[in-house]
Curated annotation (Swiss-Prot):
Keyword rRNA processing on entry: no
InterPro entries: Ribosomal_bL9, Ribosomal_bL9/RNase_H1_N, Ribosomal_bL9_bac/chp, Ribosomal_bL9_C, Ribosomal_bL9_C_sf, Ribosomal_bL9_N, Ribosomal_bL9_N_sf
Family: Belongs to the bacterial ribosomal protein bL9 family.
NCBIfam families, sorted: L9
Disulphide linkage map: none
Function: Binds to the 23S rRNA.
The protein's name in its UniProt record: Large ribosomal subunit protein bL9
């Protein structure tokens, strides 16, 4: 029996996958619990149309992410912070601070998509970070942490 999954199912597949299962598993568990629907010809047609639309939207997201990554590569990012003796910061620079600095430069991104190498920053200097615009578009960049003048 072939079914189309409506939700992700462990050890079976992801949403909108067409999978072959045993008749009892499909009829007695997957379909009644709302995890799947029977793969009728009309359901297959709807699935193929849905997948086409999703692929088109996904490509648009990838193109937009690539533009953002290109924009990021051309930027010089500097974050100013108060520092004490030995270039040690009062506090630390986090993903949120870096997201705010990027927003000022025109790159809007949520802080959860930023990964600073080595964790939070506690000293002045140059650091590397990774920005995940999309699961297929990842950009590495450097930024400077400078003291208040």
């Amino acid at each position: 029996m072939e079914v189309i999954l409506k939700k992700d199912v462990d050890n079976l597949g992801f949403k909108d996958d067409l999978v072959a299962v045993k008749n009892g598993y499909g009829r007695n568990y997957l379909i009644p619990h709302g995890f799947a629907e029977l793969a009728t010809p009309s359901a297959r047609k709807v699935l193929s149309e849905t997948l086409k639309q999703r692929a088109y939207k996904e490509q648009k997201h990838i193109d937009e992410a690539k533009k953002q990554a290109e924009k990021l590569n051309n930027l010089e990012i500097k974050i100013t912070a108060k520092a004490g003796a030995g270039d040690k910061l009062f506090g630390s620079i986090t993903n949120g601070d870096l997201a705010d600095a990027l927003a000022k430069e025109g790159v809007e991104i949520e802080k959860k998509y930023i990964s600073i190498a080595g964790g939070n920053i506690k000293r002045l200097g140059q650091y590397d970070a990774t920005l995940r615009f999309h699961r297929e578009v990842i950009s590495n960049f450097s930024f400077d942490v400078v003291g208040d003048a």
